[in-house]
Amino acid sequence: MAKKLNYSPNKLASALKSGKTHIIGVIVPSVQAHFFASIIHCIEDGLKDSGYCVIIYQSNESVENEINGVKTLLEAQVDGIMASLSLETQDVSHFAEIVKQNKPLILFDRVNADLKVPTITLDDFRAGYIATQHLIDRGYKKIAFITTIHQIKIFNDRLEGYKAALADNGLPIIEEHIIFGGLSIKDGRFGAGKLMRGRNKPDAIIAGDDFTAVGVIKKLKEIDETPPEVGVIGFANEAFSAYITPNLSTIDQHAPQIGKACAKMFLKMINQPNPYTNMEHIVLDPTVVERESTNKEAV
């Protein structure tokens, strides 16, 4: 009968009755990165059968935008929020209101230990370690590392993994081979230029993400040190990394698994009187995706 009358349920009335809007907020640094876009896609896919839709808010690496995002989403009466922190975020007190309202808050990828909430992360120490070990196994010995100046746990852990791999292989940690700056194509070009102008030039460079790695490759091409002559590896396995020249070796951070785990965790939390009962902290293992930029045998 309802179908014949072209009836559709009033979602506002349903929300008022149930206390739930079936809307989820997701805050990410940027949807331009395939990594975050893939996570969002899998969150949406994992929630649609339960009747949830997603509002996306980009922080663009700004803590001010992130604060506004939390406020905006709470005003929209979302049932919960999932977030990956901006590079600028140190104080996470703006997320406390979500917990105070007894709404699910899940942090993924970039997290902060001050927030006692469920998390889904990569083993970033291992990510830094296996990126370095991969280069060592391919014959590179003087390995540099370009990372962010911001004190974000995932990037700190990767740097520590890099240092541990060097030490385990009896290779020195050379401070001038560690560049702190931004994470972008421009920053990759700048960092590679600085490294290759130094007295102790590296024979391989680990870039903080795949965008930075593109900048590194561009600079190396300009000075006729095209990879894999100088090895380059990034992080995130962005969609473009398989199609640039030379194509880019990278660390796969398993974005689809992160998104699926976020959706599954949310559905578990939303059906509990206290969503923070039996909190989970899921840690995924990274893997190396080897391509031309570290494959000396292809030369």
Please name every model-derived segment.
Residues 1-22, 295-298:
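N-terminal helix-turn-helix DNA-binding module of bacterial transcription factors
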Residues 29-38, 56-65, 85-87, 110, ...:
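Hinge/beta->alpha junction and helix N-cap segments in small-molecule ligand-binding domains
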Residues 2, 47, 165-166, 196, ...:
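Conserved hydrophobic residues forming the short capping helix/wall of the S-adenosyl-L-methionine
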Residues 49-50, 101, 166-173, 198-201, ...:
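Short helix-capping segments at alpha-helix termini
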Residues 193-299:
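Flexible loop/turn connectors
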Residues 18-133, 137, 195-197, 201, ...:
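Alpha-helical recognition/docking segments in bacterial nutrient-uptake
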